[in-house]
Amino acid sequence: MAALAGLGVLGAGRHLWKLPVRLSAGLQGCGPRRGYIAGSAERSPTFGLLFDIDGVLVRGHRVIPAALEAFSKLVNSQGQLRVPVVFVTNAGNILQHNKAQELSDLLRCKVDPDQVILSHSPMKLFLQYHSKQMLVSGQGPLVENARALGFQNVVTIDELRLAFPELDMVDLQRRPKTMRLRSDFPAIEGVLLLGEPVRWETNLQLIMDVLLSNGHPGTGLATAPYPHLPVLASNMDLLWMAEAKMPRFGHGTFLLCLETIYRKITGNELKYEGLMGKPSILTYQYAEDVIRQQAERRGWAAPIRKLYAIGDNPMSDVYGANLFHQYLQMANRGEEEQQTGGQQKQRPSATQSCASILVCTGIYSSQDPGSQVPPPGRRELPFHGHRDFSFSPGLLEASHIVHDVNEAVQLVFHQEGWA
């Protein structure tokens, strides 16, 4: 797809791993498919699976048929998962338990809330900001999500707009008829960017007002403070795939707008105290912990040695999995602990590798030559990753490329001797 021309030449020196696709007619649930022998596979697994959601399991609100077939292989006769599984999504505009219920309904398989890792889930680790007055941007259940992450004092963009009605002036229809300014509004001490908002012009304007005024948008400052207030952001996806034939703008596009405006106005770079969501190492460390805890609860004694990350977006899923694999290799060699999004965390020693598996049912398409060649007049492909992640073409090469998630699960079972 031409819109993804910036994702590097994928699959160079790699193979498109194929297995015969076996469709299950009239699949009624998430039980093992007919004829599938699971007896030998009921041993303690030494691997875990990280599933992206959009473009891998679903397109919009429609389940991809291959996902039903894949999950029929992943459960035993009692309907329990045979291996540890987490769902790692860059979405963040839904509550964790609601996303788990949505997946349960679509996949016809029980998904627990703690198996769902939203883009902002690692914000639970940023304890130093949980008691501060934070402005939150995004959509959906913003306050509920922020409080679930541990933030005790949050202010929404709409609340700020009502307190300072003179700040939001783009939409003539929404301009207030009267100006009742509040003098008792608490100072903002930081900004949470949980996902793309609905009214970008309003959010961009008010976030800038807060940053330029050091949290006092009703007064303003002669000189913008720098460093500015702490900013935590999640979901760096420039694009994402829904029902439309072409990708849609993601939160990464909103972040790009905010960064560009801030630099143009102040001459300085917008800084983040934490960037999370794929491809951040912090998100994969968080997922690794959830996988390990899941295995412990199930009584699986064997340590989890390998992770398989299955996704459709080369820049977030493949880049992130390969970056985490690189981190694991460095840690296993005893090299210095890596900095991860403003936090440092001691990595459990068991996990040794993370393999990236790219599917062709979402952002990436092996059938579209435009997604793998530079546009006319360019030698290189444009980089669709976030500004704070350097462009490393090697990290965009998937360990394996398969057609869909069913083939991905077949590949993993083959690799692990579970087929």
UniProtKB/Swiss-Prot annotation:
<dbReference type="InterPro" id="IPR006353">
    <property type="entry name" value="HAD-SF_hydro_IIA_CECR5"/>
</dbReference>
<protein>
    <recommendedName>
        <fullName>Haloacid dehalogenase-like hydrolase domain-containing 5</fullName>
    </recommendedName>
</protein>
<comment type="similarity">
    <text>Belongs to the HAD-like hydrolase superfamily.</text>
</comment>
<dbReference type="Pfam" id="PF13344">
    <property type="entry name" value="Hydrolase_6"/>
</dbReference>
<dbReference type="GO" id="GO:0005739">
    <property type="term" value="C:mitochondrion"/>
</dbReference>
<dbReference type="InterPro" id="IPR050324">
    <property type="entry name" value="CDP-alcohol_PTase-I"/>
</dbReference>
<feature type="signal peptide">
    <location>
        <begin position="1"/>
        <end position="15"/>
    </location>
</feature>
<dbReference type="InterPro" id="IPR036412">
    <property type="entry name" value="HAD-like_sf"/>
</dbReference>
<dbReference type="InterPro" id="IPR006357">
    <property type="entry name" value="HAD-SF_hydro_IIA"/>
</dbReference>
<dbReference type="InterPro" id="IPR023214">
    <property type="entry name" value="HAD_sf"/>
</dbReference>
<keyword id="KW-0732">Signal</keyword>
